[in-house]
Amino acid sequence: MTRMAWLGAILLTGHALPAAAQYASGPTFTVEASSDERRRGLSWSDGDPVVRATASVPVADGLSLDGAATSLWGSPRHGGADAVVDLGANYAKQLGGFRLTGEGRYHLFPGASHQGYGEVGAIAGFAIGPASIDLAARYAPRQSAIGGDNLYLSAGGAFAIPGTPLTLSSHVGRSSGDVRDPLVARRLRPGGGYWDYGVAIDWYRGRWSAGVRYADTDIDAPDSLHAGATLVSRVGFSF
């Protein structure tokens, strides 16, 4: 799919729906600083600190549009991009203790040419008291910017410690896919298919949040540059 086709699909999801916004709460905005931009175990910022701004706007019952902009400082992984802009739509449905979510997202890379790509996803979550479990599948169809297609399957859990502002979480994920251009496919899967995993502790107090996360992959050298074990710290403010 072309970049315009992806953007059109995402925007059409929420077209003509703002009038129904009374079914949802208001928009939320967050600014955050982080010691690294790690996604699926890979550093998108070449191991450098980043700043990020995110926004989520509800447009109907269960439906929201969201966007995020993150500094990348000339990321080698993404063709020297100065930033990544993530644009998406999410639809969530609560069924008893289960929460089902469908999403579509496009990643733009200002400062780099022919790097943008889109993906769709589905998440099934279940909550029991302060604990929750999520199973997710996200798929990027074949696109020249990623040298083929990409499938990411993951499982995660979180536990809000009663009586404290702390939440513990962990996840494991698997990246795989068809390769049409091996050199380009290394962008999202250096060395081929791989596992990533991590654990985190986050603190929430009012509009403030902070956290520390351990991230790692099973990618072997020499493909493991900025894909190995690391600690990532962050602090954020929402309004």
Where are these regions (language model features)?
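Detector for outer-membrane/organellar transmembrane beta-barrel domains
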Residues: 117-186
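Repeated loop/turn-to-beta-strand initiation elements of outer-membrane beta-barrel proteins
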Residues: 27-29, 61-67, 96-102, 129-135, ...
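Outer-membrane beta-barrel "beta-signal"
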Residues: 203-206, 225-239
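Short glycine/proline- and aromatic-enriched beta-strand/turn motifs that initiate or cap beta-hairpins
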Residues: 21-73
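Outer-membrane beta-barrel translocator domains and adjoining extracellular loop/strand segments
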Residues: 39-46, 76-82, 113-118, 145-150, ...
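Residue-level signature of outer-membrane beta-barrel architecture
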Residues: 35, 57-59, 91-93, 106, ...
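Transmembrane beta-barrel strands of outer-membrane/channel proteins
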Residues: 29-35, 67-71, 102-106, 124, ...
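Hydrophobic, lipid-facing positions within transmembrane beta-strands of outer-membrane proteins
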Residues: 27, 49-55, 85-87, 100, ...
